[in-house]
Swiss-Prot record:
Name of the gene: rplV
Keywords of this entry: Ribonucleoprotein, Ribosomal protein, RNA-binding, rRNA-binding
Taxonomic path: Bacteria, Pseudomonadati, Pseudomonadota, Alphaproteobacteria, Rhodobacterales
Position of the signal peptide: none
Name the record gives this protein: Large ribosomal subunit protein uL22
InterPro entries according to UniProt: Ribosomal_uL22 (IPR001063), Ribosomal_uL22_bac/chlpt-type (IPR005727), Ribosomal_uL22_bac/org-type (IPR047867), Ribosomal_uL22_sf (IPR036394)
Keyword Ribonucleoprotein recorded: yes
Native source organism of the sequence: Ruegeria sp. (strain TM1040)
Length: 126
């Protein structure tokens, strides 16, 4: 097992960022991810800033990280970036319990999720 010998490659006009162990369910996180897919990054940042969802601030940090990676590591123009992909995955589930009637035990599941955001530079059409 272990780490792959070849890390994941991204195209020359792409950059990505990933956040793991977000304390929300993947279903709730996917609602926020759908909100930003395909948008220009400045519009996506504005939408996340004014979103009422609690997890939107964590997604905003991930998007800002992807933008910084594009600018610093890949020398891409920030004004021409769009959110090319934003996909959500399931992470571990914390298991907790609660005593119930007649000596039983109720299971409480506390899910975690992860999100990966890929930004791509597109040329402005005249």
């Amino acid at each position: 097992m272990g780490k792959d010998k070849n890390p994941r490659r991204v195209a020359d006009n792409e950059a990505m960022a990933k956040v793991r162990m977000l304390r929300t369910s993947p279903q709730k996180l996917n609602l926020v991810a759908q909100m930003i897919r395909g948008k220009k990054v400045d519009k996506a940042l504005t939408d996340l800033t004014f979103s009422n969802k609690r997890i939107a601030q964590d997604v905003k940090k991930c998007l800002q990280s992807a933008i910084a990676n594009a600018e610093n590591n890949h020398n891409l123009d920030v004004d021409e970036l769009i959110v090319a992909e934003a996909w959500v995955g399931k992470n571990l589930t914390m298991k907790r319990g609660r005593p119930r009637a007649r000596g039983r035990f109720g299971k409480i599941l506390k899910p975690f999720a992860e999100i990966t955001i890929k930004v791509r530079q597109v040329e402005e059409q005249a």
